[in-house]
């Protein structure tokens, strides 16, 4: 049984939905709070969490009368308590408090804590059978099989909040699993779509941060430029929808209007379209199984005029090939892929390596990990976190020689 509900069940909706937002002060959290703000009669806030932004967290807690808030940075606990003095909001700090937020009795949970730190709080929500809007990629990339099996066992409902996976989620409802031929994830191609590989190698940080369509954080914008983000999305789609690598294609679509497509056995292709605005997939998750009014701009296809497509270039973007390789290898390889990429991107931002070295460091780390015979099925959150830690250390150790080769 899948934890992703591919058939709409109208009986699942309730009049007033209690909501928890894990990562309320980040970009996804901000978009979620924007939607909650627009429909106060539909939602009640149970819990909110943040990493270290006390001011923003306290402000949200007061605005939405949150019952519980948690700050991950324990050094900020006293400041948070002082900011909420005189309110009825309970406060907590540290990893255990963030996990408690996920475990509290909310109907719907936005899992938007970034990094491996988001895995255990999301699992806390999953274990009590909540509706979980999943925006944390580590839950799937680092622990996909384990996470989805645990969700299905608990009767949790996993709602994909990422734009591409949400598009597939909507399109997959048009047929049955045995009728599916393939899913197609679209990619803008990023700022280097038409660049020569030699020029991409030398790309600067400023150039990598000029995304043509989306406004995102620094890390994900660089991942888009390298197409590592699309590799991560391929991995996520595999675990979310129980797909083999051969059932997942990537198609470059520079306009970012079609977010995902599904081909069925009768050769019908069902697509989801929309303006590039993260609030649209979040609104779909927040309203599910109903639809709520969203704030995104109305899609005007006549004004856009033309939608174009092209195959991805694996020479320009080797990170995409490595994602498929790691997915086929399995047994923790996707965790290594993600961890090595995070180390590589941080090194690029710090000026320690060239842009082209990002994929080389990921490949070197994967090869080193496979040679070491470390492949093993991940059966717990701690297993995933351990592999993530080992991979980061190996990537950091390999970094100097990768940087030297590129110089």
Curated annotation (Swiss-Prot):
Pathway: Isoprenoid biosynthesis; isopentenyl diphosphate biosynthesis via DXP pathway; isopentenyl diphosphate from 1-deoxy-D-xylulose 5-phosphate: step 1/6. It holds the Pfam family DXPR_C. NADPH binds at residues 25-28, 53, 136, 138, 217. GO terms for molecular function: 1-deoxy-D-xylulose-5-phosphate reductoisomerase activity; manganese ion binding; NADPH binding. Its cofactor is Mg(2+); Mn(2+). It comes from the Bacteria. This is 1-deoxy-D-xylulose 5-phosphate reductoisomerase. The gene is dxr. Belongs to the DXR family.
